[in-house]
Amino acid sequence: MGKRLLDKLWEKHVVTTNENGLDLLYIDLHLVHEVTSPQAFEGLRLTNRKVRRPDLTFATMDHNIPTKDVWNITDRIAKQQLDTLRENCKQFQVPLADIGDEEQGIVHVIGPELGLTQPGKTIVCGDSHTATHGAFGALAFGIGTSEVEHVLATQTLWQRKPKAMGIELKGKLQKGVYAKDIILHLLSKYGVAVGTGYVMEFYGETIGAMEMEERMTLCNMAIEGGAKAGIIAPDEKTFAYVKGRKYAPRDYETFEKKWSELYTDADAIYDLHISIDVTDLAPYVTWGTNPSMGVRIDEKLPEKHDVNDERAFSYMGLSPGQSTYDIPVQHVFIGSCTNSRLSDLEIAAAVVKGRKVKEGVRALVVPGSKRVRDAAMQKGLHHIFEEAGFEWREPGCSMCLGMNPDQVPEGEHCASTSNRNFEGRQGKGARTHLVSPAMAAAAALYGHFVDTRKESYDGAISYS
C-alpha cells in the first residue's frame, strides 16, 4: 500500500519511539514570538541549558506591537514581553526580527517570504496557526510553552502520529470567491471538530489552480476544524515561490529533486476522505462565535438549534432568519496571518479603488510584514487605500486579537479577514465576522456585507 504525504513527512523525522507509542520528532525549524516564549527561555536559564540549534530557530515580534506608532508601547505587559524576547534572543544567540527590522512581521508571514519555510520540513511555533506553513508540503503545527522549551533545549518533540484526512477540492471558483470562502464553507458544513486527531491534506484541481498565498489561507485555518495541521503537496508553484529567497537552500536543484517526492501515492488510503466541489461556492460570512457559524452571503441566518446558537445570537446581537446584508459593519480589518499578504492587499485594493469608505466605518489595512508593506507601497496600494479612507498601518497581528491597541469597541461589528471570531477575540464585547479580503473591503464601502460576485456591488443591496 502506498504512503500518504503525512506518512512520508513523519517517517523522515522520527528519532525514536517509546513504549507508549510516542515518536520523538526532529524539528527542522522553530519559530518564536514574544508571547509564548518568555517562560520557555526562563526554563533554560533555570536549568543552565543552551538553545540546542540557534541556527534552526528564528524569532520575531508581532502579537503585542502597535501598528500605528510602533515605537510608543504604552502597555506595561506588552513592553515587558517585547523587551524580554530581545534580551533572550541576545543571550541565547537566536536570530531576531526586531521592531523596524526589514524582516519583521507576523511569524507565519515572514517564514514563507524569507524562505525559512520549505517543503519537507517539520516546523513548530508557540502559536495555533503554525499550520499555515503546511501549504509548502511541510509538517507544521502549534505547540505550548512547555513544548517550546523542550524544542529550544533538544530540537526534538514527543508526538503521537495523527491520522490522515484527504480533502479533495474540485472545480473552479467563481469571480469574487476565494480560498477563505472554501475553508469557511468546510467549517460551516463539517464543524470545528471534524479534524480532531487528523492532519488535513488538501489536494485536487482547485489546489493546483491556487497560488501559494491562497494555499496558505487554507492551511492556516485547518486548526479551526480541529486538525493538528493542514498540508498540501509541493509542486512547481511551491518550488518557484521558495527559489531565490534569503534563507532558501543554495544547492536548490538537489533540494527540489527531494521535494518532488513529497506527495501522496496513488494507491494510498486516507483514514477519512472529504470531497468538495467549489464551482457553485459563494462568499461566506460568519454570524456567530466560532468559525463554523457561517453562511453564504445569499443565505439567511440559520435557526437556533441549541444553547450555543442561543448564546451566539445574543452575543452578536443578531436574529435567526436575518439577511446577511442587514448586518451592520462599523469596523473593517484587513490583515492577520490568514489574509495580510501582498495578493490579499491587491484584491482588497481592486475593490476600493476610486471609491470611499462609508461614513461612520473605521477601516484598517495592516500588512503582514515589513516586506509586504514595502512591496504594496511600491505598487501604490497605500495611496488607493488612504484615498478611499482606510488607515494604512505598520505590520503586526493588530486587530486579529485583543492583545494590542487595535481593538473593536464593545457591541460593534467588525468585518475581519482574520481566523477566529470567539467572544472577545478582538476586544471585550467585540462582534467579529470572518470574511475574505474582498468581502471586508466591500463592507467598508457600504457599512454592511455585499456579494463580491456582483459586477456592481450596488446590485447586492436590493437583496431581501
UniProtKB/Swiss-Prot annotation:
InterPro entries, per the entry: 3-IsopropMal_deHydase_lsu, Acnase/IPM_dHydase_lsu_aba_1/3, Acoase/IPM_deHydtase_lsu_aba, Aconitase_4Fe-4S_BS, Aconitase_4Fe-4S_dom, IPM_dehydratase_rel_enz, IPMI_cat
SUPFAM superfamilies in the cross-refs: Aconitase iron-sulfur domain
GO molecular function: 3-isopropylmalate dehydratase activity; 4 iron, 4 sulfur cluster binding; metal ion binding
Record EC number: 4.2.1.33
Keyword Metal-binding (UniProt): yes
Matching CDD domains: IPMI
Tagged with keyword Amino-acid biosynthesis: yes
Binding site for [4Fe-4S] cluster: 337, 397, 400
Required co-factors: [4Fe-4S] cluster
GO biological process, one term: L-leucine biosynthetic process
NCBIfam families tied to this protein: leuC, PRK05478.1, PRK12466.1
Protein name: 3-isopropylmalate dehydratase large subunit
Lineage, uppermost ranks: Bacteria, Bacillati, Bacillota, Bacilli, Bacillales
